[in-house]
């Protein structure tokens, strides 16, 4: 069993199964140990004083965390990776690694809600100017650059409304002024999109979602390009970040089955959306993998697959009360704000306070769905009975 450095080029499924694994380093066991320890001992002062040892203190890593970091680095094609204790923690660390007091950062108007909250409530305290941009801006983002612009934060597709972005064009423009490009890639996972290959410098995943995949651990990952790695590594050590070893191990376990699960999520989602699109009570589906979606061409160019997160809008005239009654009538779909696990979920979409430069649709009742691993026929039956109960 050889390390990744000596393995031939591999396809994505094979990388997911083997990345970060070195069984011979652990007496032949196929999985690394789950290290529960804070203190690291040295054999002598000659080793201790100059720091000539791989591990010095658990906050800086252990064999468990290094296994996941190595796996993410290989899968993302990165210079290095870091593990955070949640997706939001990963987002905050990534942003703080490339901005300082007096800087200007551009953030997509369709960013994840907690990302906006961090940008609006934390960054101004560091004298960092936050400005939001229309996700459809593409190369025209250069018109928003200032002398103090140092970072552009992207997310594709957009949170709740699923707009696609021309990531390569944005990255090319940003690099002309030496700005760092960040991307929240949680929707697609590193299996279906490789942000660094499109010019992104910091690829961020809420590992809680598809990487863990079982709704039983919280995790975040950050994969850095060569130009962004030094800043991320330096900040990570200074911030005292460390993810719990059991959560890290569950992330490693989830990686091994990521392709199998996402294939099912994608297939189930297409089946459910094909049915939903035929319902007269539904006016629009938001899912970039559909040919009818405005962002389909960008999705097809830059992504190799789609996940289970989508949304739909009710027909005109549907009231807020009817939309909520529909959700209450669901039996299989749980009402919960997370996604990426085995279970199907639904939430009402509320864009109040969530958009700055793009106008949210007025009086449109929308529902976000996460399509899980259940049989799609059962999911369709659940949606059907909820529609009938609500609109009978």
Feature locations, PLM:
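N-terminal glycine-rich, Lys/His-bearing helix-loop that initiates the first secondary-structure elements
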Residues: 1-52, 392
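PLP-dependent enzyme catalytic core of the Aspartate aminotransferase-like
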Residues: 2, 120, 129-131, 317-318, ...
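Conserved PLP-enzyme active-site core in the AAT-like
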Residues: 2-8, 16-22, 81-279
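Conserved N-terminal alpha-helix of the aminotransferase class I/II PLP-enzyme fold
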Residues: 39-92, 114-121
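Structural preference for beta-strand elements that scaffold enzyme active sites
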Residues: 151, 180, 202, 284, ...
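A common structural junction motif
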Residues: 240, 328-338, 386-392
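Short, well-ordered beta-strand elements within core beta-sheets of diverse protein domains
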Residues: 251-260, 308-316, 367-372
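Conserved small-domain helix->loop->beta segment predominantly found in fold-type I
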Residues: 270-331, 335-340, 351-361
């Amino acid at each position: 069993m050889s390390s990744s450095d000596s393995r031939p080029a591999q396809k994505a499924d094979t990388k997911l199964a083997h990345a970060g694994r070195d069984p011979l380093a652990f007496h032949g066991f196929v999985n690394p140990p789950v290290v529960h320890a804070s203190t690291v001992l040295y054999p002598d002062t000659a080793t201790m004083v100059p720091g000539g040892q791989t591990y010095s203190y658990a906050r800086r890593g252990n064999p468990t965390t290094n296994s996941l970091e190595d796996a993410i680095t290989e899968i993302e094609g990165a210079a290095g990776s870091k593990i955070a204790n949640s997706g939001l923690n990963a987002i905050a660390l990534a942003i703080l690694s490339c901005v300082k007091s007096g800087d200007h950062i551009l953030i997509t108007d369709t960013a994840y809600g907690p990302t906006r909250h961090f940008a609006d409530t934390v960054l101004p305290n560091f004298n960092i100017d936050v400005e939001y941009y229309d996700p459809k801006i593409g190369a025209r983002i250069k018109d928003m650059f200032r002398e103090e612009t140092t970072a552009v934060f992207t997310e594709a597709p957009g949170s709740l409304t699923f707009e696609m972005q021309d990531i390569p064009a944005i990255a090319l423009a940003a690099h002309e002024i030496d700005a760092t490009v960040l991307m929240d890639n949680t929707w697609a996972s590193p299996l279906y999109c490789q942000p660094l290959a499109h010019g992104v410098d910091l690829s961020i995943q809420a590992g809680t979602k598809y990487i863990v995949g079982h709704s039983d651990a919280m995790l975040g990952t950050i994969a850095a390009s060569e130009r962004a790695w030094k800043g991320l590594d330096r900040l990570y050590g200074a911030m005292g970040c460390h993810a719990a070893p059991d959560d890290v191990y569950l992330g490693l376990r989830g990686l091994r089955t990521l392709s199998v699960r996402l294939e099912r999520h994608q297939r189930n989602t297409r089946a459910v959306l094909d049915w939903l699109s035929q319902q007269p009570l539904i006016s629009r589906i938001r899912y970039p993998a559909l040919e009818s979606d405005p962002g389909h061409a960008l999705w097809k160019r830059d992504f190799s697959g789609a996940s289970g997160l989508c949304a739909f809008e009710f027909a005109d005239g549907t009231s807020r009360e009817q939309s909520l009654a529909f959700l209450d009538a669901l039996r299989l779909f749980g009402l919960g704000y997370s996604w990426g696990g085995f279970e199907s979920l639904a939430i009402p979409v509320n864009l109040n306070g969530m958009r700055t430069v793009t106008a949210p649709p007025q009086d449109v009742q929308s529902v976000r769905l996460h399509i899980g691993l259940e049989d799609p026929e059962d999911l369709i039956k659940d949606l059907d009975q909820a529609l009938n109960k609500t609109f009978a």
